[in-house]
Amino acid sequence: MPKLNYNAIAQGYSCDLVAEYLYSLGVKDMMVDIGEIFCDGVNPSGRPWTLGIDRPEDGNNDPGSQIQGIFKAPEGPHGIVTSGNYRKFYVRDGKKYSHSIDPRTGYPVQHSLLSATIVAENATLADAYATYCMVLGLEESQRFLASRPDLEGCLVYDEDGVFQTWCSDGFVLEEAE
């Protein structure tokens, strides 16, 4: 039986709260990862934070085990959040249903967009916009991101059974090794 879960931006908000606390202690270089990510500064090697974007394979429940691409976080504080339908879904009568509900229809979304990774000024906003993109679908998300210079995004979608990637101009995704 499907269950409703209302925590769409809770993890992003929690990252921001932890980051605020770390700032209050004088920490300048950080990566807060509690399901969603907030990062600022550099990693312990003095380089930009590097993140793997998970390949949206059904059942890929081990973050980092199957990587679609590598992303270097931009300078300054940012929230970096991925929403997708490859970990949270259900199957009924042989048909897969996403956990994302389109509020315009009241039904689970049905489109080719598999995951949306968003970079915003904080993790709360990134979380909200990643969820929003998962409701919009590929084409509407592309238009939305193109209209928002304050956001960067990477969309992974299914094109005839093959994973394809679309990234906004400022989101550089390198191939995973």
Where are these regions (language model features)?
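Mature catalytic core of soluble alpha/beta enzymes
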Residues: M1-E177
